[in-house]
Regions:
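Active-site beta-alpha connecting loops in nucleotide-dependent enzymes
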Residues: 51, 317, 335, 339-408
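ATP-dependent carboxylate/acyl-activation modules
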Residues: 110, 318-320, 443, 447-451
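Phosphate-binding loop of NTP-binding sites
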Residues: 8-11, 91-224, 228-238, 428, ...
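Short beta-strands and strand-loop turn motifs
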Residues: 72, 105-108, 134, 185-191, ...
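Mobile, glycine- and charge-enriched loop segments
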Residues: 35-46, 133, 151-160, 347-368
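N-terminal leader/targeting and accessory segments in enzymes
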Residues: 1-94, 252, 354-355, 381, ...
Length: 456
């Protein structure tokens, strides 16, 4: 991270410094909350987790090389510097906000109900053709992960592409206050997190909190094909730019041609030009992601050649529509997360396979009071597509199995309460050369299924 002294940190978070004068003016090398990732001269912030209290590890982190610790407790007779704060979690956010303000780079904030990560990856791939880009790693998109991502920004970075994930009102405002985006991208307004946000209108309200702390001279990029986002009016005097498959959008695509599991070809139209590109990851939703990347590239002064190269350089992440070919199976690893819209999109991809189509689906979380019906509808959708075999695992997924079984379809349906139950029957269900889609909410830990299938 860029230079920041303990004095600067104490002032930023309103903490009280305890320690020697010399250390007060020393710079920290990084900020960590995991005692296992301590490095020389880092700042360790003792976060209280649901299972572990970081305060337990403060002495060990100092022995391992940390310069200072942030603590909510007075440390009697401490032989090392520490900063006393009311809340370590709030201090983490305050320090990140201060650090972000000190940085001279462009920030792209990406949010939405579905496709945040794949859109973030596409935008980073496009912008990476011209700029030195830092992007959110893994699922570091919440009020803990975003600050840690901010601290990874170095002086050489020219653009940061940050994923912002929320599940309740007020969270986006707090994230935007830290990120201070120059460009805001919203992928869609779906039904994820209905448990807290109650309706799609509630989700729209929560997601558009991202505009509250954006650069007043920045850009807003929205999916114009989304019925909710298409109603968004200028925010803070900024006229939104819309992308989509409809030719009335500012950025649109047509002549979309599926290459099966090998990706998609499309022709892209900008306000000034037209060009074609190949996307290596399958699915129509990836065309929308590419359009978001094109709009972001235009906002940052890129030309068509650079943008096309960035689109075609994109590679999938593990657990995100990642195609894995083994001696016996073709696996579509999309197990990182799931909601009804993303699961249906993945089923559309599977339906393009020219071998026997098998999907292993699990529970989708945080869908609110209509969760059973939504699982039922996903099962019905799989059957209507004519997927050969549907395997449903988990308590909620029993409704998925019911939704498929009640259709007049060729789809064979198997239901298991647990992953272990499925593993016992997998050899009976799967055939050599099958194409297998694996998808569920992250809490279902379906990466275990992917790992087992890779070894068959």
């Amino acid at each position: 991270m860029k230079n920041m002294t303990l004095k600067e940190i104490a002032v930023a978070c309103g903490g009280i410094y305890y320690g020697d004068d010399e250390s007060y003016y020393k710079e920290v090398s990084s900020v960590v909350i995991d005692s296992r990732k301590v490095e020389k001269d880092c700042l360790f912030i003792a976060i209280r987790g649901t299972r572990v209290d970081g305060h337990m590890f403060i002495p060990q982190t100092i022995r391992d090389g940390a310069l200072c610790a942030l603590s909510e407790k007075r440390i009697e007779n401490a032989s090392y510097p520490y900063i006393l704060v009311t809340s370590c979690e709030q201090a983490l956010k305050d320090i990140a906000e201060h650090y972000r303000k000190s940085l001279n780079l462009k920030v792209v904030g990406v949010t939405g109900s579905v496709g945040k990560t794949s859109t973030k990856e596409m935008i980073a791939s496009v912008l990476g053709e011209k700029y030195d880009v830092l992007k959110t790693a893994g699922n570091f998109n919440n009020e803990i992960g975003l600050p840690l991502t901010i601290f990874n920004i170095r002086e050489e970075h020219e653009v940061a592409v940050l994923e912002l994930g929320i599940s309740n009102f007020g969270e986006m405002e707090r994230l935007a206050k830290i990120a201070r985006p120059d460009i805001c991208v919203i992928t869609n307004i779906g039904v994820a997190h209905l448990e807290h946000l109650k309706s799609r209108d509630g989700i729209l309200k929560a997601k558009t909190e991202i505009f509250l702390y954006m650069n007043p001279n920045g850009s807003i990029i929205l999916n114009g094909d989304d019925d909710k986002l298409s109603t968004v009016h200028p925010a803070n005097g900024i006229q939104p730019v819309f992308f989509g498959l409809d030719d009335s959008r500012d950025f649109y695509a047509d002549q979309v041609e599926s290459c099966g599991l090998r990706g998609t070809n499309a022709v892209f139209h900008t306000p000034n030009s037209t060009f074609s590109a190949h996307i290596s990851i399958p699915g129509e939703h990836m065309v929308l992601n590419a359009l978001a990347g094109i709009a972001a590239g235009y906002a940052l002064g890129m030309n068509d050649e650079e943008i096309k190269a960035g689109i075609e350089a994109l590679v999938p992440l593990a657990g995100r529509n990642n195609l894995i070919e083994t001696d016996s199976l073709t696996i579509i690893d999309d197990c990182y997360n799931a909601n009804p819209a993303s699961t249906k999109a993945s089923l559309d991809v599977l339906a393009k396979a020219d071998t026997r189509q098998v999907t292993v689906l699990g529970d989708m979380f945080e869908l609110g009071p209509t969760e059973k019906q939504m699982h039922y509808e996903v099962g019905k959708y799989a059957a209507d597509l004519g997927i050969d075999i549907l395997v449903c695992i988990g308590q909620l997924s029993e409704h998925m199995a019911t939704g498929a079984s009640e259709q007049c379809s060729k789809t064979q349906v198997f239901y298991f309460e647990t992953k272990d139950d499925f593993f016992e029957q997998a050899d009976r269900i799967l055939n050599p050369k099958d194409t297998v889609l694996v998808k569920a909410s992250n809490g279902m830990k379906f990466s275990e299924i992917v790992n087992v299938l890779k070894e068959r």
